[in-house]
Structures are given as C-alpha cells and as structure tokens.
Amino acid sequence: MTVVEIKSQDQFTQLTTTNAANKLIVLYFKAQWADPCKTMSQVLEAVSEKVRQEDVRFLSIDADEHPEISDLFEIAAVPYFVFIQNGTIVKEISAADPKEFVKSLEILSNASASLANNAKGPKSTSDEESSGSSDDEEDETEEEINARLVKLVQAAPVMLFMKGSPSEPKCGFSRQLVGILREHQIRFGFFDILRDENVRQSLKKFSDWPTFPQLYINGEFQGGLDIIKESIEEDPEYFQHALQ
C-alpha cells in the first residue's frame, strides 16, 4: 500500500468519499519548511508499505499548497495526522514521534504489532491524545532530556510549548497565545507538555521559566504570554524581527 500525494481538492474529496465505507483514512498534513515532516514522511512511507490491509488509505497533503483542505481541519501546525473512519474523525495527532503515530495506527486499524518496529526517529512534537510518557522517557538521564529539549525547541522556527493543542487548549493562557500567533499569521509548531512530564518539568529549568505556555523562536526562548504581549506592544513587528 502506498501513500497518495494529494494534488487537488477534487482528488481529496474523491479519495475520502469513494469506496470509503469502513476504511481507515489517514490524512498526513506536512510542509516543506518544517524539518520534523522529513522524518515523518519517511516513517509514513515505511509503515504504508507494511500495511497490506485493504481497509487503510494513506493521503499526504501539503498544508501550504492546499489551504482549502487544511482549513477544513483547522491545521495550525505540522506534521499533523487525522484519522477518519466512516466519515468521522476518530483521532488527531500533532507529532513527529513515530512511536505515537504507529501506536495509533495499530489501535485504529488492528494492524500487526510488528508495525512498531518499522518506525524509528527523533521525537519532537506532541500527540493530542497521548496518555503519558513512555518507559524510555521515564528512564531519561538529565543529559538525555536536555539533548531532547535542544531538538524540540528547534523543531520549527516558532515552537510553542503549551497545555493541550491549538485546536483544544487546556488553559486560558495557552489559548490566548495561540490566538496571538494566529492573529499575526505566524506558522508554528507546538508541544503539549501535559503529555510528557519529563519535558514539562525539565523545560522549566531549561528555560529558567516556571510556567506555561513558553514560546521559542529560532531555538531561543522568548517568554510566556505576558512577555510576548509586552514585546508586541513595544514592537508591532516583533515576530518579523525575531524571525530574522
């Protein structure tokens, strides 16, 4: 089974409606500017070759080239996965974590557990519905978690560490900062710190900042909600200047 690259909205509509009954449709939203998508594109290709079931369909969508499709699912960050079954969204993941993607695919498609061995790669962003940290994460040393944080804060030019996801924030401060980024039309990656206690606690020390959300630009800590608001008040072009 191969991944179908979406070229038009008509093609997307056809593939998500024609002979789609009882099929698990996996939508993969990506962008050329997002480095984590490179890893997940490779993972998706590898996994799709191992899934021989006729009831799974993989569609790859460039979020920038097809905004009309991205808007339908309120895509605010990439990589982003949407699992659809019988016309209903059954799960959404914003992640560059192969283990989380494969685990979700296994559960929803009843795929063989051996699929888990076909995807390996670095972790970066979050699974909106993850239940918690893995055993590997619990055993991380301080050096290992710091190395992971360095990768995470640089996973996208603008990285937001928040409670919840852009589509479902878990606190008012996170919701406000997402709104500010969208208002200024800033592309951003995000990490749901509620899903990973190691990241949640270690990032406070890493950033020397005790609360969330936290915003990073080009790998540099910018501040929390109040600091970002103040920065914009002082410089309306704050984001443009920070991204230079």
From Swiss-Prot:
GO BP annotation list: actin cytoskeleton organization; cellular response to oxidative stress; intracellular iron ion homeostasis; iron-sulfur cluster assembly
Domain Thioredoxin: 3-110
Gene3D superfamilies: Glutaredoxin
Spans annotated as Disordered: 116-143
Record's keyword annotation contains Iron: yes
PROSITE patterns: GLUTAREDOXIN_2 (PS51354), THIOREDOXIN_2 (PS51352)
CC per GO annotation: cytoplasm; cytosol; iron-sulfur cluster assembly complex; nucleus
Keyword Metal-binding found: yes
Keywords from the named record: 2Fe-2S, Iron, Iron-sulfur, Metal-binding, Redox-active center
A molecular function GO annotation: 2 iron, 2 sulfur cluster binding
Domain of life according to the entry: Eukaryota
Binding site for glutathione: K163, R200, F212, L225, D226
Pfam families reported in the protein's UniProt record: Glutaredoxin, Thioredoxin
Residue intervals of the Glutaredoxin domain: 146-244
Protein family per UniProt: Belongs to the glutaredoxin family. Monothiol subfamily.
Physiological role: Monothiol glutaredoxin involved in the biogenesis of iron-sulfur clusters. Binds one iron-sulfur cluster per dimer. The iron-sulfur cluster is bound between subunits, and is complexed by a bound glutathione and a cysteine residue from each subunit.
UniProt protein name: Monothiol glutaredoxin-4
Species this chain originates from: Saccharomyces cerevisiae (strain ATCC 204508 / S288c)
Upper lineage: Eukaryota, Fungi, Dikarya, Ascomycota, Saccharomycotina
